[in-house]
Amino acid sequence: MIYAMSDIHGQYELFRNLMEQIPLGKDDTLYVLGDVVDRGPDSMKILKYMMANPNIIPIMGNHELMALPCLKLLVPELSNGFLHKLSSQARQSFAEWTLNGGISTIQEFLKLPQEERRQIVEYIESFRLYGKKIINNGEYWLIHAGLEHFSE
């Protein structure tokens, strides 16, 4: 069976409740269609759960896209003056991300040991841009939002 969900936004308890509703077996696949992170308090918990389950296929959402360059900068241990050392583009990326709910993700990410931070970043980097399935002779595209400049 193939399942899909999206826009979990750090809501681990709601995610776990949904997972209890899905009889996800070893031969089943769950596509998570983006926006796992931000807004809610438990983005890292959800990402770790997904990492531990190879039949969960993550698709990149706009929140992961905003988070990724910032999280890469947060992998090393932070030093005094961290913000002053950032380029103006990096500061702008952080500002945009925090305005879109990234603060909870940053706080949670910084509590992780450096090695776990690195693993989280590598995992998000592995997110697909889309999935494509053929079911009953129908072709289905699994994406977060839309395909820009798409034409048949």
Please provide the spans of the model-predicted regions.
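Catalytic core of the metallo-beta-lactamase
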Residues: 10-12, 133, 144
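Residue-level marker for buried hydrophobic side chains located in beta-strands
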Residues: 4, 32, 58-59, 141
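Short, solvent-exposed loop/turn segments at secondary-structure junctions
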Residues: 9-10, 64-65, 146-150
